Swiss-Prot record:
This is Phosphoheptose isomerase. Keywords: Carbohydrate metabolism, Cytoplasm, Isomerase, Metal-binding, Zinc. It is found in: Cytoplasm. It catalyses: 2 D-sedoheptulose 7-phosphate = D-glycero-alpha-D-manno-heptose 7-phosphate + D-glycero-beta-D-manno-heptose 7-phosphate. NCBIfam families: gmhA, PRK00414.1. Catalyzes the isomerization of sedoheptulose 7-phosphate in D-glycero-D-manno-heptose 7-phosphate. Pathway: Carbohydrate biosynthesis; D-glycero-D-manno-heptose 7-phosphate biosynthesis; D-glycero-alpha-D-manno-heptose 7-phosphate and D-glycero-beta-D-manno-heptose 7-phosphate from sedoheptulose 7-phosphate: step 1/1.
Amino acid sequence: MYHDLIRSELNEAADTLANFLKDDDNINAIQRAAVLLADSFKAGGKVLSCGNGGSHCDAMHFAEELTGRYRENRPGYPAIAISDVSHISCVSNDFGYDYIFSRYVEAVGREGDVLLGISTSGNSGNIIKAIEAARAKGMKVITLTGKDGGKMAGSADIEIRVPHFGYADRIQEIHIKVIHILIQLIEKEMVKA
């Protein structure tokens, strides 16, 4: 009944991944991001991650697998997803939604830490403000974006961009693959410590 639709969806997902893989800059950016994160951890730093909607879930998933585990048991790594509901509702009410991540970065971010901002459009105002706050704190910034990078293009130390201009879910599918690879590479780098 839906076999053609199912095949079409899976083929489109495979095509999006294949297009991402064609660009060696994407592979290099993933490697550089993993090394940057591991170097921060080795120096006593942490990563703060943020996103909206599905990207918020990806930010939490990233932090959870760093503090908990990915595939194998190992020590937890210092990662915080900016996802505290009381913080988000307070800042949204008192300052505005654009400040939900930046206020948290201002409060707990330190020089040597890393911000991971995830936005499929690259136009999330609250992540742009978080990047500005991270810069003011002397933090490094990694972004996972899509399409043409939006307003976030060029704002990070390392941008990993999925150049897909269709639905956001295709971009998110690559983002979660990148997140898992980042964790795998971080684990390899931390063994070298």
